[in-house]
């Protein structure tokens, strides 16, 4: 069921204008929840967290899984960030990732 929700979210967020709005919302969510460990620009120069700029477009599932369930020292965000917020974060990360 969770995967169905994310698939529906993906199709909803496919329009470019919506993606820009999502990226702006994602920037706010990132600043509030992620920047402490991942840094202001998606990378922590102390190397204590993954460089999010390295995520490729085909790594959406990896990103969602890591956010929901945590990874290494990263805590799980399931129950804290809903599907819409996670998709907004993804839009922000992809808008600022290496091409």
How should each PLM-predicted stretch be described?
Residues 6-10:
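Hydrophobic helical h-region of N-terminal Sec-dependent signal peptides
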Residues 1-4:
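Positively charged n-region of N-terminal signal peptides that target proteins for export
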Residues 23, 27-31, 81, 98-99:
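Short sequence/structural segments immediately N-terminal
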Residues 23-27, 39-66:
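Gly/Gly-Pro-rich "capping" loops immediately C-terminal to redox-active cysteine motifs
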Residues 30-36, 41, 70:
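Short pre-active-site segment immediately N-terminal to redox-active cysteine/selenocysteine motifs
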Residues 11-29:
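Electrostatic cytochrome c docking/interface patches
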Residues 45-53, 68-99:
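Axial heme c-ligation environment in periplasmic c-type cytochrome domains
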């Amino acid at each position: 069921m969770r995967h169905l929700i994310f698939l529906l979210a993906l199709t909803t967020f496919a329009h470019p204008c919506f993606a820009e709005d999502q990226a702006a919302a994602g920037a706010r969510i990132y600043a509030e929840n992620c920047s402490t460990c991942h840094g202001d620009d998606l990378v922590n120069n102390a190397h204590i967290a993954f460089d999010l700029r390295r995520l490729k477009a085909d790594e959406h599932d990896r990103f969602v899984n890591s956010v929901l369930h945590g990874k290494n020292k990263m805590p799980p965000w399931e129950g804290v960030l809903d599907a819409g917020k996670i998709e907004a974060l993804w839009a922000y990360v992809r808008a600022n990732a290496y091409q």
